[in-house]
């Protein structure tokens, strides 16, 4: 993924000499990322889009390693796109440099884009009358409301590519989970997880 990321991130880091640089990277399961990317680019099919690349070989860890090597003084924060609804406030706090318990405005604006209008209203009303005591409780409530009120068109990804079957998608997902584990162990990388 992103073969010139090392050069481009290094150039970005040089824009403000002496400034502390941080990079934030959302990763996504290649089994859902590729179909979405192909739909956006109107690619003819996976064989044209991927060429000789084996879909099982697609990993995010080399990208993160390249960014770290090109910018050894910079920290890199990574999260899985699939987890975004549960960890959105943490992402915002990390990106803005706020302390972990800082209450930010608009932390549920993202959820409004993936939930029904009735669902987001109910969730906000619930949080108003039952403020969560910690992040774990907040995540459980968000997960419960998403289970009931998610806008399926916004969160479901249809994987319908020629030559891709359930076994391939499952194998890609397992490889992605192993890749996440490798990223989590990298020095200078903060992986935000639920």
Predicted regions and their residues:
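Anion-recognition interface
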Residues: 1-194
